[in-house]
Each structure stands twice: as C-alpha cells, then as structure tokens.
A protein has these predicted regions:
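Surface-exposed beta-strand edges and flanking loops
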Residues: 111, 120, 174, 219-221, ...
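Short, flexible coil/linker segments at or flanking structured domains
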Residues: 140-142, 158-160, 203-205, 245, ...
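A contiguous, surface-oriented mixed alpha/beta subdomain in the mid-to-C-terminal portion of proteins
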Residues: 171, 180-249
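Charge-rich, low-complexity segments
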Residues: 1-171, 291-330
Length: 330
C-alpha cells in the first residue's frame, strides 16, 4: 500500500489550500489566483521555494540590496572558472565539411545538440580530418558560463554515455558565494579523481545564496564512485561552507548534501522540468485536487499519493522514480 514518506508528510503541516482551489498558504506566504488551474502554477513556485530550494519567501528585505538586472557576476564567474580542474571536454559528432582558411582550416561538425564550426585544432580524434560523414571527437571548452541562467555550467573531462540512461543528481547547500567557490572546486576535483562521467552547475549570482541547490552535479553511468567521492570531499566543510538542510524531495547523504534521480514522468509533455519543479508540480496538483474534492483533512495524503504515482514518483521516497531499479538505490 502506498503512502507518503514521513519527511514530506511532516512538511505539509505548513501548507493549506482553500477557497475552492484559489488560495494557498505555504509557510508564511499566501498565494492567490482566479482559478485552480492558475493557482497550480503559483503554488508550484511557492512549494519549490519552500520545500526544494529552501528560500521561503525569498528576496531581500527593505534594507537589502535591490534586485540585480543580470544573473551573471563577472568577478564570481572568474573565481568559479579558476576552480575548474580541466580545460576541455570530449564531444563526438559527425563531420559535415572541412573549410580551408588562410589562418587554419575550420570544421563543420554536427553534434547531438547543434551543428558547430570550430578550428581544426579542436580535433582530438582522428589525428587528421577524415572525409565528411565520418565521426570525429572534438575537445571543446568545458566551462560554459552562460548556458543555464543564473548558473555557471561545466562538462566533465570524460565523455557522457549515449544514450544517457538514468541520471543521478547531487545537491549541495552552500551558505554564500565564497563557500560555493570552495565547494565547487572540491566537488569537481573529487569527480575528476574518481573518473566520473558528469556535468555540473553552480549558482553564479551572489544575491541568490543560500540555496539548497547551490551546486548541482549530474552523474551518468555508475554514479556510486562519483557520489562517494563528492560526499567525502565536502563533509569536512559541513557547518562552515555547507548549510545543514536539504530539499524535502531528496535523500540526505550528509548535512547539506542530498541526492535524487532525474524525473522519468510517463505522461507526454512533462519533460523539460527540473527535478525540484517536477516534484513541486506533482505536489501542487495533489493538493489542489484535494481542495476541489472537499475532502477531509485526512484525505489529503491520498490525493498527493495519487498525483505522485501519475507523475512516476515513488511517494514514500520522492527522491526515486517508480522506475528506479533496486540496485540504483545504493
């Protein structure tokens, strides 16, 4: 028989949905909407902030600095870039064309995500450009500062498996930007030493700290060596660089360090959401369904369980999907 995990069930004590699914209270924050459909989106955001990111109502008080006009901070990005232990990442693609140029040939290569034009010296295998249509391996920049808004993104020095298969996420709760630089460098160094296949991102806006997902690591293939290495590298900083709490939707590995599996929602049109957004959306759906059913307070968990099952989430362990294999839980 399905039920909600104790941690999530306990957290729901700060949530109330009423007024026919048009008003909700999450912690000390009230959100309203003209319809249950509109409320679901706003409630999803509030649950994401309260239960996953840990920002509560978020933002600065009246005496705090004004909102930034950009999510990028050049000084912080330079520090984050300096902490990356490798310069390039291998990417495999199909050669489309060789373009002779006076200053050196260029290659047009069709990668999984896009078709790019690069200098021929980016070719790492084979040694010389083959005929168009052949597969080649390029050495591209590992650091990609503007790829994910508000985050500094990096690819590991080892190729990712294709197809990707299940992806394990690690979340690190950095207290501030200085702590994030320290934790970022330590995590990447541990991942490289462990031979992990991964990519990762870290908050690049100093005003957005602290967050429970300040650093996010995406582990491919056998996640366990990389996961153990990151935990071992970061545990010595518990209580100083890391804040203790973690997302309600995740599995806590150590204070301020948590893990979960990428969503595997069986319904069409549900891809594209982050882990935290996916879990918060499912939770909001169940809470609003309960409000519309005029059910008893004790029925609320049953509605949330139903919404989680429809979204492919294990309601007892929301860090897992229903498709998570037993061996993946280790």
């Amino acid at each position: 028989m399905w039920g909600l995990g104790a941690r999530l069930a306990g957290a729901l004590g700060v949530v109330r949905v009423g007024d026919g699914g048009r008003e909700a209270v999450v912690g000390g924050r009230t959100v309203t909407a003209d319809s249950p459909r509109d409320l679901r989106g706003r409630l999803t955001n509030a649950l994401y902030e309260e239960f996953h990111a840990g920002r509560g109502q978020g933002g600065f008080g009246a005496d705090g600095p004004p909102p930034r006009r950009t999510l990028r901070d050049p000084a912080l990005e330079r520090r984050l870039a300096a902490a990356v232990p490798h310069a390039t990442t291998p990417v495999r693609g199909r050669l489309v064309e060789v373009l002779p140029r006076p200053g050196g040939d260029e290659l047009v290569v069709r990668l999984p995500e896009a078709t790019v034009r690069v200098r021929a010296d980016r070719l790492s295998a084979p040694a010389v450009p083959p005929a168009p249509g052949a597969y080649v391996e390029l050495a591209l920049e590992a650091a990609r500062p503007a790829l994910s808004p508000g985050f500094f993104y990096v690819m590991g020095s080892r190729p990712l498996p294709r197809p990707a298969g299940p992806v394990r996420r690690l979340f690190v709760h950095a207290r501030d930007a200085d702590a994030a630089v320290l934790l970022w460098g330590a995590a990447l160094g541990a991942l490289e030493a462990a031979g992990a296949s991964y990519h990762a991102k870290v908050l690049s806006d100093p005003q957005d700290f602290p967050r429970r997902d300040s650093v996010v690591v995406y582990l491919h293939g056998d996640h366990r060596p990389g996961e153990r290495a990151v935990v071992a590298a970061l545990v010595p900083h518990a209580g100083t660089a890391t804040a203790p709490d973690t997302s309600v939707f995740t599995e806590e590995l150590a204070p301020g360090i948590a893990a979960a599996w990428d969503p595997e929602d069986p319904r069409p049109g549900q891809d594209g959401m982050s882990f935290g957004q996916h879990r918060a959306f499912a939770l909001a759906s169940g809470l609003i369904a309960h409000a519309l059913a005029d059910g008893e307070p004790g029925d609320r968990d049953a509605h949330v369980v139903r919404a989680f099952l429809e979204a492919g989430i294990d309601p007892r362990h929301p860090q897992h999907n229903l498709t998570t294999r037993p061996g993946d839980r280790r």
